[in-house]
């Protein structure tokens, strides 16, 4: 009979599982015996535990410490070696290959992210912490592989990345405003209204933005869903640059006064007169004395005549005196007159 022998030592924290012979019983059931030296029995000085597993299905062996070891029915040897900072590294041979697969056991209070990053999570005392880790989704577009990872943490927590950055998750404001976390890949231009981004936190995790497309990081933006937000009247655009933090550019939006067409080519005196007429017209429209709808132009004939007139610099109309003056004449016409004078003299 083959036995799975488990040696547990609290001082060295080493766990060695050796595989021997497995005896098959009737009905396709395999008996596995676990021997633990930490607990002593009456007869042989060792306590024997027997597990019944179905042949052909993955075997799951639970050893001391709450660690789970799985195998596909093949004889395996698992060795757990204590690592640095209270971590345990397990080496498991991979079927079909000659190498060893290392499994790093993460202690409680720590999150292991794909890519070798470890996030330390510390919650406040007396609060129930709930951590939801979503599996990474891989999307292949035009030969480029992009991997996105999202970690949603409910409750106020402090997370620390492998680079030493400290991230504070604050889902609820002091006024009870519910915050919404949005995770987007840093692969293009992100446009967010400035009103929604007021008082938000921008946190970047993952690889640097100057690496290849496969190692692109993510930017987590915390947006307030409701609350008193002061609209700054601008649009915030986050453009990934060469640094680790994306650059933020603010573009002014057209206001109510810019949406209405302004008269062109007027001086200061005319502009002030236009403003006075607008105020007077708004007052009459509010009183209901004149309709609010205005025609495009008052008289079509005058509009055609104005469009047909010649204009000088700045769109000004030529006065009759300026038309007759020699410096305002057409240069081609002046050349023709000069040639006529030369012919007459000769």
Swiss-Prot record:
Q: Which residues carry this modification: Phosphoserine?
A: 325
Q: Which Gene3D superfamilies match?
A: 6.10.250.2430
List GO molecular-function terms, semicolon-separated. DNA binding; DNA-binding transcription activator activity, RNA polymerase II-specific; DNA-binding transcription factor activity; RNA polymerase II cis-regulatory region sequence-specific DNA binding; sequence-specific DNA binding
Question: Biased-composition ranges for Basic and acidic residues?
Answer: 310-327
Keywords attached to this Swiss-Prot or TrEMBL record, sorted alphabetically, are: Activator, Biological rhythms, DNA-binding, Nucleus, Phosphoprotein, Transcription, Transcription regulation
Q: Name the Pfam families on file.
A: CBFB_NFYA
Start-end of DNA-binding region: 295-320
Known role = Component of the sequence-specific heterotrimeric transcription factor (NF-Y) which specifically recognizes a 5'-CCAAT-3' box motif found in the promoters of its target genes. NF-Y can function as both an activator and a repressor, depending on its interacting cofactors. NF-YA positively regulates the transcription of the core clock component BMAL1.
Q: Which InterPro entries match?
A: CCAAT-binding_factor_CS, NFYA
Domain of life, per UniProt, equals: Eukaryota
Cellular localisation: Nucleus
Query: What GO terms in the biological process aspect are recorded for it?
Result: positive regulation of DNA-templated transcription; positive regulation of stem cell proliferation; positive regulation of transcription by RNA polymerase II; regulation of stem cell population maintenance; rhythmic process; stem cell proliferation
Motif stretch (Subunit association domain (SAD)): 265-288
Tell me the lineage of the source organism. Eukaryota, Metazoa, Chordata, Craniata, Vertebrata
- What family is this? Belongs to the NFYA/HAP2 subunit family.
Name by which UniProt lists this protein = Nuclear transcription factor Y subunit alpha
Indicate the quaternary assembly. Heterotrimeric transcription factor composed of three components, NF-YA, NF-YB and NF-YC. NF-YB and NF-YC must interact and dimerize for NF-YA association and DNA binding. Interacts with SP1; the interaction is inhibited by glycosylation of SP1. Interacts (via N-terminus) with ZHX2 (via homeobox domain). Interacts with ZFX3. Interacts with ZHX1.
Main localization is nucleus
Q: Which source organism does the UniProt entry give?
A: Mus musculus (Mouse)
Q: Where is the composition biased (Basic residues)?
A: 298-309
Listed GO cellular component terms? CCAAT-binding factor complex; nucleoplasm; nucleus
Disordered: region residues: 298-346
Query: Does the record bear Phosphoprotein in its keywords?
Result: yes
What PANTHER family does the database record attribute to this sequence? Answer: TRANSCRIPTION FACTOR NF-Y ALPHA-RELATED
């Amino acid at each position: 009979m083959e036995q799975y022998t488990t040696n547990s030592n609290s001082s060295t924290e080493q766990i060695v599982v050796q595989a021997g012979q497995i005896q098959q019983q009737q009905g396709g059931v395999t008996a596995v015996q676990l021997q633990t030296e930490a607990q002593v029995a009456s007869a042989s000085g060792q306590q024997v535990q027997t597990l019944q597993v179905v042949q052909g299905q993955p075997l799951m062996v639970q050893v001391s410490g709450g660690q789970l070891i799985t195998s596909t029915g093949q004889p395996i040897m698992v060795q757990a070696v204590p690592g640095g900072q209270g971590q345990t590294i397990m080496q498991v041979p991979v079927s079909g290959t000659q190498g060893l697969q290392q499994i790093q056991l993460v202690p409680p209070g720590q999150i292991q992210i794909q890519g070798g990053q470890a996030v330390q999570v510390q919650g406040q005392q007396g609060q129930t912490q709930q951590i939801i880790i979503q599996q990474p989704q891989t999307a292949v577009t035009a030969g480029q592989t992009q991997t996105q990872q999202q970690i949603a943490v409910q409750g106020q927590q402090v997370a620390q990345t492998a680079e030493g950055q400290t991230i504070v998750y604050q889902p609820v404001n002091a006024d009870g405003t519910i915050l919404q976390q949005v995770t987007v890949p840093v692969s293009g231009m992100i446009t967010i209204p400035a009103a929604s981004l007021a008082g938000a936190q921008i946190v970047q995790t993952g690889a640097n933005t100057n690496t290849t497309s496969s190692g692109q990081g993510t930017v987590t933006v915390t947006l307030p869903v409701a609350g008193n937000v002061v609209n700054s009247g601008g649009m915030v655009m986050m453009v990934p640059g060469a640094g680790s933090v994306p650059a933020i550019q603010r573009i002014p939006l057209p206001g109510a006064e810019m949406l209405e067409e302004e008269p062109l080519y007027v001086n200061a005196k005319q502009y002030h007169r236009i403003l006075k007429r607008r105020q007077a017209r708004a007052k009459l429209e509010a009183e209901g004395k004149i309709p609010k709808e205005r025609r495009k132009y008052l008289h079509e004939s005058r509009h055609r005549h104005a469009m047909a007139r010649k204009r000088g610099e700045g769109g000004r109309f030529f006065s009759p005196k300026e038309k007759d003056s020699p410096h305002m004449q057409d240069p081609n016409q002046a050349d023709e007159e000069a040639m006529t004078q030369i012919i007459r003299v000769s």
